Amino acid sequence: MNPYVSYPEIHMKRNRTGSINSNPLYIPNPNVEPTPKPTKRRTKTGCLTCRRRRIKCDETKPFCLNCTKTNRECEGYPNSAAQMQAMGSVSPPELSVHSAQQPLIPTSIASSSAQTGDTFSGSSQSNFNTNDLNQMTSSSNLSTVTPIKQDHQKPMNLQGFPSAYQQHQYLQSNHNVPTNNSSSATSSTKPSVQSVGQASYPFLSSVSNFPSNFNSELFPFYFHDVVPSICAFEFDNNIALHFWSVTVPQFAQSMPCIANSLMAFASIKKLDVFGAYSHLTRALRCPMPGPNSFEYLLVSAFLTLTQLNLPAYDLNFCNNFIRKLSWSSSTKSNYVSLLIAMVVRELVFAILPRGCIWGFNGKPLSEVSVSRSHAPVSDSLFTIGLDILSQPTLSDDLHRERMVAWRDEYHVHLYSASRSPLTKVIDCVGHAVTKNNNDVLSGLQQLMQEECTDIAVLRTSYLCVLSLQNVFASNSKEFKLRAQIESHFGRLMLEHFMDCNVLNRPVL
């Protein structure tokens, strides 16, 4: 008997054609049509980079987070048809590049700028590799531009900002600087510090309309203090006036990193160290523009100048920015030249009270040749001063020889009674850089007797006084005179700060 029994083979089909339902009681209804899947529609509001890559854009303004995370260059967002109709046939100057959107020019500012009859400069694009910032637009064309409403963020109210024409008239009347028709600084009758208040600045009444995320005190201070201080050494050049009073606020309106870095720079100008630290931290947390953009240079300039005036600073960051800004000088642009000239001056002002900063290297900027016909005296002096402060180990006699050659070239003489306070204080800077302490003291004594209220002269004189600390013996008459001069200019600066304050100001 065979113990093995053979069974017939059964072939099983392993592939089932029907659907398997875990519920045995489920019976499909053939009369019910399946629900169609929702079709995905492509949106036209994403950034150009994500649309080209065919991925979903999170539409974060001004930079897409997808591009930021992948270290790609965000090309911005296209304008809608309604915006293009509102713009008309004339478009505003393109002040931003790739990652930044175009800043808006309000009608009030544009129309007031057109009243001057001068041609202001605007940058076409800020990418140094492909575009040139020298493409200027006439201010008469800007008068037809209407402001564009942006949905991604609430823009700042620029109604409280002074127009370029108001700043132009203010600098002519109060800051002892010539117009374009004059080649040298001329003296003028200046109002007292107490008269420079809300009566002289009617636009301060609308400061309360600023958004809550912006400091309502610093932006008026920027226009009343920082802009006049910068434009005084530009000798009232229209391009510089328009850039610092109109273009830079538009950058700050559209980009939070520029706004916070600008407020940090204004805080340090106001001697507010805590506010400078606060805004500096906020600026570093904001998304930064592309590294090859003009906006990046502007933010880095404000951050560098703020850091050098603080007790703790990152010297590597400052030196790296100086090198990059010197490389950008090859771009033939009025805006880049303005930024380089301002940075050179502010670097000298930051180092002058300290005597020197070991490890600081400003030679790359001092070797840059920026030819500007409207301010050759100040540009040449501060360039030489930056080079001297970057080489503290060299002999003082070599530095003095360079400064003497500068005075002979531009016919600058300290004891000339016909000179304006601005040119006198420029010469005091030259003596302070070369450590001619007695000449600095004599020049500041002359300025103290003139009772000048120009904020550029006051601030520069105060910094020159600080450079004389621990120089004279405590029982000498020079020491007492230095203390009197420091007290005089310090009091005038405090009164100026109080006049720039839009809140209830206490009476001193």
Curated annotation (Swiss-Prot):
Residues 46-76 bind DNA. This is Transcriptional regulatory protein moc3. Disulfide bonds: none annotated. Pfam families: Zn_clus (PF00172). It comes from Schizosaccharomyces pombe (strain 972 / ATCC 24843) (Fission yeast). The gene is moc3. Residues 15-43, 110-146, 174-193 are annotated as: Disordered. Interacts with zfs1. Keywords: DNA-binding, Metal-binding, Nucleus, Transcription, Transcription regulation, Zinc. One of its GO terms (biological process) is regulation of transcription by RNA polymerase II. Its main location: nucleus. Induces sexual development and ascus formation. Also involved in calcium homeostasis. Residues 176-193 have a biased composition (Low complexity). It is found in: Nucleus. InterPro entries: Transcr_Regulatory_Proteins, Zn2-C6_fun-type_DNA-bd_sf, Zn2Cys6_DnaBD. GO terms for cellular component: nucleus. GO terms for molecular function: DNA-binding transcription factor activity, RNA polymerase II-specific; RNA polymerase II cis-regulatory region sequence-specific DNA binding; zinc ion binding.
